[in-house]
Amino acid sequence: MTNVLNLLNEIGIEELRPPQKKVIEEGLLDKSKNFLICIPTASGKTLIGEMALLNHVLDENYNLTGKKGLFIVPLKALASEKFDEFQKKYETYGIKVGMSIGDYDTKEDLSKYNIIITTSEKLDSLMRHNIEWIKDLSLAVIDEIHLIGDNERGGTLEVILTKLKNINAQIVGLSATVGNPEEIANWLNAKLVTDEWRPVELKKGIYLENEINYINNQDSQKKSFKAVKSISRNNLTDLIVDSVNEKGSCLIFCNSKRNAVGESKKHNLTKYLSKAELNDLNSISEEILSILETPTETCKSLSECIKKGVAFHHAGLTYQHRKAVEEGFRNKVIKVICCTPTLSAGLNLPCRRAIIRDIRRYSQNGLIDIPKLEIHQCIGRAGRPGLDPYGEGIILAKNEKDVEKAFLALTGPLENIYSKLSNQKVLRVHILGLIATLEIKSTSELINFIKNTFYAHQYGNLHGVLTNVSKVVEFLEKNKFIETLDDDFTPKKNRVLELTLDNSNNLVLDSKRRMDTLTNLSFKPTNLGKRVSELYIDPLSSEIIIEGLNELKEKINDMDRSNIDQYIFYIISKATEMRPLLRVKMDEELELIQEMDKLKISDYSIENIEAFKNSKMFLDWINETPEEVILEKYGIEPGILRYKVDQARWMTYSSKEIAKLVKLNNDKIYKALLEMEFRIEYGAKEELIELLKIKNIGRVRARRLFNIGIKSKMDILKNPEKIISTFGDKVGKKILDEFGLKYGQQKLSGF
């Protein structure tokens, strides 16, 4: 303990905050104890995780122990942030900090690192490659552990935690918002530590008709009020200006990307800002326009908003645009960000006033209330330690009925978190992963693993999940991902596919036989199963790809290259990883069906028509249709396009790997997959591939170079003046710098 506290003192942390002291007193530095720590945002959760990490990787004399600690975060951006922070703090002490957030089909050598920062999905994929260093793992810190209840990602986090429990690593879970912390702590066999202390007071209130009605944190019946001066026709503008005039900043949480953009356009803060602030805003505005080779309408809208002191932030922006907005806000240049609640998922963007504009949002089932857990995550961003005297979490009410709902959202208990493990896609991916890595070799081991999950702990009765497990195992066997071996029974009888449990949760294959008499029932992964597990894709997607490529093989001799490309995109667009697909409007349907006919596609289900529309978008992308045209034609944002392109690149690579394994024996298909993987990454035709391998040259610049006769690296070296004249000094010099070539030199240094 002394070494940890002394080291913190050396890096400038002289006194721990009350929750941090409390956790130490409760035994955090006892490596045999698991912890679930539920304390407010900004109260020091990350440092608690750091203390646990230091306790494992350093001994009393600051020598490295050889043990490793994981810091698991929900977002790649957050991983990058923590990586930079931890490196600066701890490399002086010989602690090597590593980060793994890249492609799933990689076996990075992380053995030299003492602290490894990653996401749950990346960790899961690493484990499928039988990493050696896992034997040295003695601690896992899980940030935002409440995401175990997330519909999309919760199942993976639950499986990871179950694996970590099985290898007896210390587990430290961190969260600000858990409705049922006792239940999760019991499952983890963890000490639960809760605390309400915050470094900055958080005032919660409801805003209606230019008045904030504050709710007393100790007594919700006691209320205080603040009148907000009316200076515009928009009472939300009034609330923003009220904060800006007090040197505060605002996050406004909206229920959709469209509303976040629309809201940001309504506010103009220029007359409340200094000349220096306006100059800084103009600089960020110009930076936004220079990020992409050709600015899109979204770029232009964001740039214009930023000039006025306001920005929007959502998944539709590219990573570079989001980063620029975040930095501008942290540096107190951008005063307001209108965003979706995804911004609250762990990013370090505190503000003076967090405003919930909408307490309801649209879902597949219509308009629903936003969960209280999510609202509390959002308002927890309010209050910057050392910068703000207090923080405010305010819900905007439109009428008295909204006031009642807002009051319940601010004062009512948080929702419980529920396991998402019973989802069939989650089970397909993870049961195959467990069998492929030989972690699970028999029916009994599979049942024991399931018994150790949060699902089993929460529901007790496993009959529901076992029904889905049975279906998944049947699917995996039928499609040759696994083999089941049973020496006592014929393959058709009493198979693992007929899993049931008795009242004591013992496996029963029929009314007379129990699991303990069937130890010879075992699983074995096939080569296909192993590879699909390593690729980290849904086995159902693999089956779709195999079936689709075999269909293409029958048709390929009647197709030109463009049709082959589109058919491959159609196949991968049907994969589960590609959802949600582009929606098909009623007036598009007939035309799309007619185009499908030309490729001899006869299944006109809505999912297939949507997949075909997706294939058209990807074909436009690799044929160099301008990005702005694609965005308008398909009604999507730049960030969503980049995400879909990245997913398509991964599925194209996976298709190529699967095609090799199943011996498709068709050179045309394999060649198309090989070229498409690179083309889709850059969105260009084959002739530009060599130029695209050069840093600072994207598809637009590559096409401009090709059109003036610059087609290779050697052409660039021979014609540096053409590079400068085509792109100007700034961009041209960046390109030439990649070769060590300064403008005016006639040869390349060190080439």
UniProtKB/Swiss-Prot annotation:
Q: Which residues bind ATP?
A: 20, 39-46
**Family, as annotated:** Belongs to the helicase family. Hel308 subfamily.
Q: Which gene encodes it?
A: hel308
Official protein name in the record:
ATP-dependent DNA helicase Hel308
Keywords in UniProt for this one?
A: ATP-binding, DNA damage, DNA repair, DNA-binding, Helicase, Hydrolase, Isomerase, Nucleotide-binding
What molecular function terms (GO) are annotated for this protein? Answer: 3'-5' DNA helicase activity; ATP binding; ATP hydrolysis activity; DNA binding
List each copy of the Helicase C-terminal domain by range: 235-435
| Domain named Helicase ATP-binding: residues | 26-196
Q: Does the keyword Transmembrane apply?
A: no
Q: PROSITE patterns, per this entry?
A: HELICASE_ATP_BIND_1 (PS51192), HELICASE_CTER (PS51194)
Q: Could you say which EC number(s) this protein's record lists? A: 5.6.2.4
InterPro entries, alphabetically?
DEAD/DEAH_box_helicase_dom (IPR011545), Hel308-like_dom4 (IPR048772), Hel308_SKI2-like (IPR050474), Helicase_ATP-bd (IPR014001), Helicase_C-like (IPR001650), Helicase_Hel308 (IPR022965), HTH_61 (IPR046931), P-loop_NTPase (IPR027417)
**Pfam families, alphabetized:** DEAD (PF00270), Helicase_C (PF00271), Helicase_dom4_arc (PF21280), HTH_61 (PF20470)
Picking any one GO biological process from the record gives: DNA repair
